[in-house]
Amino acid sequence: INYVSKDVDGLHDFYVNILKMDSIAPQQFPRTDATSDSGYDGKIKFATEGSMQMHLAERDLDVAAKNGRHINPVERGHIAFRTDDIEGFKRHLRDHDIPFADYGTAFAAEWYQIFFHDPEGNIIEVHQQVA
């Protein structure tokens, strides 16, 4: 689950101290270096209760425009699912006329990510490990 905030440290402290989740070292999630026209360089912290991860990211309303995409995954947060066949899943979305934003590895060096909306406008990420 990805939540966004203007106060990532405060949000992380809430999940770690109040809900007693464990902090995950950011080194476990290598990031792609952001450039002036690609990627994301906002603050991110991570927490887990053992089977689910929280990715707590700094809100950035310009990410979609900067990356030339129509969906901004750090505008209001999203849920994520893992696949072993990202190309097959993209075909599946196309077959159902569901538009998606293909960010590739722009955000995470080891994860290929796409984002799309459910019927209510909630953002969904599907990703595949690439390294």
What feature does the model see in each segment?
Residues 54-58:
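A short acidic-to-branched-hydrophobic micro-motif
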Residues 30-35, 62-67, 102:
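A short, acidic/glycine-rich surface segment
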Residues 61-62, 85, 106-107:
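Short beta->alpha connector loops
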Residues 2-52:
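Core segments of cupin and vicinal oxygen chelate
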Residues 11-14, 89-93:
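Hydrophobic side chains in well-ordered alpha-helices
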Residues 1-6, 42-50, 66-131:
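Vicinal oxygen chelate
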